[in-house]
Amino acid sequence: LGEEIAYLKIKSFNVSNIKNDREKLHAWFKENAEKKIIIDITRNGGGTDSYWQELIVAPNINKPLESVSYYLTPFGEGTQEQLKLDGVNEGTLDSDLDKLYNLPGLNWDDLEGISGFGTTMRRVSPAFDKAVCSGPFYLLVGPNAYSSADGFAMFCKNTKFATVVGENTGGDGGGRNVCVVKLPVSGLLLRFRAMHVLNPDGSSNVESGTVPDVV
């Protein structure tokens, strides 16, 4: 790739990798502090947002960065208790769906059965007095970048931490934790998100994923 470019591929943001990867990544960023950084998450199936917030973004920024996303939810009876544990309740939801009508990509069918919408904010503060890398950063994504990997792509696009390059992600980032219910007959446990995350233009993140800056 040349002496001015450094390439890093991260296959997972699994929470169990944070401890082992923290020092490795910090050393790698210091070694390549003056280079253009390419981070490849094209086959990253996700894990936890804490991974990319603490190990990638925080060491390489000089000021706090914030990314806000909308989500829709029916706030159904079967998921209210779990959503409340995650900070979602009647007080945090806005029932005035008319406020979303100015979003050009919104599919009105997505509002059927929805009782309100809320916002999720991802805020990352600098880890050090000075960023380790001077950048710029480029994030490679594709349809296999999913969950928290998509959340990272969404964050990069919204905050300009990195230029997002590639194909649409697999989506499902930017929301809260999943809910778990027990099926009454089989007893099987079902995991799902009781919310529908929107991209900044109102389009469905679940259906479209995050659209790169450069395709």
Task: Describe the predicted segments one by one.
Residues 1-215:
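C-terminal "post-core" interaction segments
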